[in-house]
Amino acid sequence: MAILIYALACAFGLGSWLAINGLWVELPIIVTTLPEGWELPSYLTVIIQLANLGPLLVTLMHKLCPGRLKESVVIYTILCIGVLACFLLAFFLGRDNCGGWGPAQRSLLHHYFLPGTSGLHLLSHLPALHDAAACPLHHHTEGGDTYVLQTQYLPPNFTTEVFFFFLAVMMCISLAAFWKLNRLPRTFEVSTENLVPDSVSSVCSGLDNPAVRTNSQKHLCEVTSQARPLLTKSGHSMFQLTFIYLMVVWVNGTTNGLLPSVQTYSCMPYGNLAYHLSAALASVANPVACIVAMFFPKRSLVFLGLLCVMGTGFASYNMAMAAMSPCPLLQKSALGEAIIVLSWVFFTGSLSYVKVMVGVILRDESHSALVWCGAAAQIGSLIGSVIMFPLINMYNLFQSGDTCSTKCPL
């Protein structure tokens, strides 16, 4: 039963960011055809942040109308919208832009936090099956001796229509997994809910009938009294929690807002192959980091802080190359392409590990700490995307260029 639940939790979790991650990995092909061009990622980051209105509305419903909102119905609705969005993208990508949604992970059981997180990004690397588009130069003659230089991209092995149909099927699998999870017997809730000690303590207090207390109840009271300090004791000081939350804001702001907005400017000058590999391999680094966190958890705040600094260093290099677009360092060289690809992979992998481990730490702290972790993550993502949007689309601090015909000084 445990293996089945783990598998279903992973299958359900992959639907959370599958459509969005798939859209990001497909950007090397999409940006060459849509009118937004290199600015498209900055639009997507802002559009994705609008999805935060959903959790906000759910929170307001819980506060204003407690007990009336069924989260399972909400998640069913969101998953169905995700399936529909993928189908619409397959048919209307050239005419309409839309962002995907992902189901809230609150319904995942406390005990299956890590497998759900791993499944959340499990299949985000599948778009790497696309072959990178080449960049041949096409010459044709007009009026005798006049040559016109045009950039043409070779089509990938799979069209965007096939790709988004595949994403729709994956979303259907996530929907089926959630349906199955809702119908499994929940015999494991007693061991995962924090409400159990409170209910046991009411039995121990003997409020209903103080004169009647069996030996088993007395033994249960003794066990509960010994376990209670372990459940209520906080393992981190206020300074440490502040550091953790600031790290959550920074890591999510960087990975979900600042850097994704400029990935095209950072990678495209090195060619479509470098952009394709950066997007695909960075998506692979995400689930790999989650799996590493499952088997090699490291809760040391010093280690996580150093890892965060290292990831920030890679992020700084990526941002610097984007600022130098369309003529970054080591352009048109194999070394430059390799460095930018590895920089994006290590940036994503290191900070993904930090995000997972910080979530595990705050999960063990308390349920409210984990809720505030989610709030801090969304705040950081929102700040990052809001900062980058005007810099790219209004102030034009990042310049696009033609990957084949742009001439840069030596």
Curated annotation (Swiss-Prot):
User: Topology relative to the membrane, per the entry?
Assistant: Multi-pass membrane protein
Where does this chain mainly localize? membrane
Where are its TM segments located?
3-23, 40-60, 73-93, 158-178, 239-259, 277-297, 301-321, 334-354, 369-389
Of the GO CC terms on this record, one is:
plasma membrane
Fetch the Pfam families from UniProt: SLC52_ribofla_tr (PF06237)
Identify the glycosylated residues: N157
Q: Which reaction does it catalyse?
A: riboflavin(in) = riboflavin(out)
Where is this protein found? Cell membrane
| Molecular-function GO term, any one | riboflavin transmembrane transporter activity
Identify the keywords attached in UniProt to this record, alphabetized.
Cell membrane, Glycoprotein, Membrane, Transmembrane, Transmembrane helix, Transport
Tell me the first and last residues of the signal peptide. none
Similarity comment:
Belongs to the riboflavin transporter family.
Q: So what does this one do?
A: Plasma membrane transporter mediating the uptake by cells of the water soluble vitamin B2/riboflavin that plays a key role in biochemical oxidation-reduction reactions of the carbohydrate, lipid, and amino acid metabolism.
Q: What is this protein called?
A: Solute carrier family 52, riboflavin transporter, member 3
Record lineage: Eukaryota, Metazoa, Chordata, Craniata, Vertebrata
